[in-house]
Amino acid sequence: MTQVEFVKLKRPEKARHLCELAEQFFNDGNKILIIVDDKNQAVTLDRFMWTWHKGSFIPHAFNNGAVDCLDEPIIIEIAECNPHGAEILIMGRPCSFEFMSHFRHVIDFAEVYDQQLASDARQRYASYRKTGFAVAMR
């Protein structure tokens, strides 16, 4: 069964949390897929992951089709595809339930600093439970 965990964001710092979570899961020996909205977000996150924390190294690649990234433990992706068989999905944007069901562990964000984003997160939380996912707050 897919386990979905929500991370509460009190400030718009999703990129930092994406990096922290990716590093934690990587250090535990997992392959991770990070899904973002578009190429601009993917390139920005790719660059940020190299510099976000002094002394931190997170091996990753943006699957832009120009580089072979299948051996990387962390892949940044725009489309709902899992090219390296990751079991961990970190959602920088919402994904379909069908896609989420292919992962053991999914991270979503409750962006409580914004009323509309918080409402959207509550709706996703309820939908995940109704779908049969195991849902919790992280």
Task: Outline where the language-model segments fall.
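Short, hydrophobic beta-strand segments that form beta-sheet elements in well-ordered domains
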Residues: 34, 74-77, 87-92
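SF2 helicase motor core recognition
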Residues: 82-102
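Helix-adjacent hinge/juxtasegments
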Residues: 46-84
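Short, well-ordered alpha-helix to beta-strand connector turns
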Residues: 29, 72, 86-87, 103-104
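Glycine-rich, aromatic-bearing surface loops/beta-hairpins
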Residues: 104-138
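Long, hydrophobic N-terminal alpha-helical segment
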Residues: 1-42
